Amino acid sequence: MIGGGVSLNRMYWHDRNREIDLLQTVVKHHPRFAGTPQWFDHDSSFHLEGGDIVNLSGHAVAIGLSSRTESLAIDRLGEGLLWDDGSSITDAYVIEVPQSGNRLHLDAYLSPISGDTFVVDPLLAREARAYHLRRARRRGSVHAEVCNEGLARILGAATGGDPVRLIDFGDSANGPVAFEYGNGAAGILPLAPGNLCVCAENLAANEALVEAGMTVHPVSIQEMTAGFGGPNSLCLPLMREDL
């Protein structure tokens, strides 16, 4: 769910599109979803995956440009989100996703966990390039500009212009925490603000979250990733409550 509507994506691997077929059946036929806008055409030839979509607020979304999500797919999604009358999204931020180990999507590097608090991999904060998408003058078109102000300010603007709290667990390139980042430390499933489902094996990261005032629910990484994906992208909600 994004901005009051749903994105039914085109997966990179053909066999995984059957998962989206099931979701499309639910959205099309279940009365709870009657009239729900659809922002992306599942039959598109351009790939877009849910792990690259991170909701930042009711009016802003981050979209990862990665090996699994193409720029043309982001253009199509941006047009729907920014121009459809049923969408609450006014700003979209495209963030280039680092390619590090087996982490493929934006949600493996960035997780909103409580209002203005985010877990961020220093690799993303340090190296990623970002672009701001807004409505252009001509109806249906999108204006893109490079963001030069850094990730913290981007997230601050997306959540209301106030300073945000960024939590990192140390340098993801070196030291013992490098294993935990590769093991999904920054890919967190928020059950509610400050109430987090995390990979049990990431002991240092989970301790840091507790020290930051979060409630953690450790689950084995084998269980969290049993569907061949990250904990967030495998559990994207079909309904969201306003905060």
Regions found by a protein language model. Give the residues of each.
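The feature marks the mature, well-folded catalytic cores of soluble enzymes
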Residues: 1-243
